[in-house]
A protein has these predicted regions:
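Conserved beta-strand segments of alpha/beta enzyme cores
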Residues: 31, 53, 165-167
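Short, well-formed alpha-helical segments that are part of the catalytic scaffolds
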Residues: 10-28, 33
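A conserved acidic beta->alpha catalytic loop
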Residues: 25, 36-46, 50, 59-60, ...
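Extreme N-terminal starter segment of soluble prokaryotic enzymes
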Residues: 2-7
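Short aromatic/hydrophobic "clamp" motif used to bind/position activated sugar donors
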Residues: 87
Length: 271
């Protein structure tokens, strides 16, 4: 069977524990591009074993420790290195369902240039797929024709920007997000996002009080929305539920972001 005419872009940094699973799920794609941030484990060896191309993340978009500070810029860098007209991006700890692979094959071979929304599902460490989570249906624009987009935006939680007049469509099949590691792993990961978000929010000349009030109300509303969804899940979900510790972490993220922003203002005023 012919390869799927689509570039798959994967960000890596010491991703040896999850990369093989990810690459195995996209082995039917014609162009697999690894954007690496200076891995020192077996990441690059695994990439070569699967025949993936490797580029180094531009140091302009990284911190002094080599971690990404501008995800949109790193994604744009990979987009510029793509060989195919279609582009699909994911993280090294994610993997693709066979149904989604078949759907992407159909889209890239028969559909006009467009942008497509995929749906992510969490997978527990015992292999069970989570049926009910407060973030479901968890949509994400991950597949697109390069001619249909402007590029990426947002330094964290990056998103692709379609060109004017391009209406995103939905895709069948799931993108799996394993809940590997303990809760501290996810807490550390989110704390990094908090630090980047605070840096972004405080880098301009906006007045502090309107900023923190806006952030406080926005994240309080999001947290309340998740809480209501969680109550509904507890009452009506008969399938596999997202672990409670992970649901609580979402509320912790929003609270810690506001606290970190307040502390950043205090540090600036006393320095």
């Amino acid at each position: 069977m012919d390869k799927i005419p689509c570039t798959v872009s994967i960000l890596t940094r010491n991703s040896a524990t999850t990369l093989a699973r990810c690459l195995e799920s996209v082995k039917e794609f014609s162009d697999v591009l690894i954007s690496d941030g200076g891995s020192t484990d077996a990441t690059l060896e695994i990439a070569r074993r699967f025949g993936a191309r490797v580029i180094r993340q531009d140091p302009r978009f990284l911190s002094g420790e080599g971690r990404i500070e501008d995800y949109a810029a790193v994604r744009d860098q990979a987009l510029g290195e793509a060989k195919e007209a279609w582009f699909f991006f994911l993280d090294s700890d994610e993997y693709v369902s066979t149904e989604l692979v078949a759907e992407i094959r159909c889209i890239t071979s028969s559909k006009p240039a467009g942008v497509f929304i995929l749906y992510r599902k969490y997978v527990l460490q015992d292999g069970r797929v989570v049926d009910c989570s407060t973030t479901y249906p968890n949509p994400s624009m991950r597949l697109f024709a390069r001619a249909a987009v402007k590029g990426f935006r947002k330094r964290i939680h990056e998103v692709i920007v379609p060109k004017e007049g391009v209406v995103p469509q939905s895709v069948k099949g799931d993108l799996y997000v394993p809940l590997d590691g303990d809760i501290e792993f996810w807490r550390t990961k989110r704390d990094r996002y908090i630090a980047l978000e605070v840096k972004r929010l405080t880098s301009g000349t906006r007045a502090f009080w309107p900023l923190i009030i806006k952030v406080l109300f926005r994240h309080a509303a999001i947290s309340a929305h998740y809480a209501l969804r969680h109550i509904r899940i507890l009452l009506f979900c008969r399938g596999v539920k997202m672990p409670f510790a992970h649901e609580i972490e979402r509320h912790r993220y929003h609270l810690r972001l506001v606290v970190a922003l307040w502390r950043a203002r205090h540090e600036c005023s006393t320095s």
